[in-house]
Amino acid sequence: MVYEGSLSFNLFPPNNYFRTMHFIEVYGLSTNFMRYAYDFVLLDKENRKYTGDGASELDYYGFNKDVYAAGNGKVVYASNDHKDDKSFDVTKLKKNPLELYGNCIGIQHKNGAISIYGHLKQNSLMVKMGDSVVSGQKIAAIGVSGSSFFPHLHFEVRTSIMNAAEGLPSYFSNIYALESNMKIKSGFVETGSIVLTK
């Protein structure tokens, strides 16, 4: 039974066991490292993500815009050679689940958590494995590499860079939630929220 608002749906026949799963589980991955992941899309003042018809990545406001480190840490993963062509080979996931993100950076922070920045622009990485970074440092540019339909930044925090990683919640500071006209000093961002950075 699934509850949505005031409607209840009888989705399954009675007396059966079901388990939710993600498509990548068939490739040997059984954890939910994207449980608290975000896809950030840059908008104009009219909340549009692109100009024209959006047929080219160049039409998108976010394409080639700077990406900054969310916190101090050390680069533990860096991939820079995926094309910005929306191509993705799902069979590579078993060897490396980070293939989902195309060009990608993983930064390990003092508490052990790792922040992931995915779908970065080919050859835009300004850091490499082993580099130390500081919060707010420019590290790359937004692209459309990996399993991406349009230019955006995939951001998540996880327990490990390896396959057994679990997703961790992210807290954001100094942003405005435009729908509620409220400043968020520190807290969560809801999926679908439009926020203004300050």
Residue positions per predicted region:
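Histidine-centered catalytic micro-motifs
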Residues: 116-121, 150-158
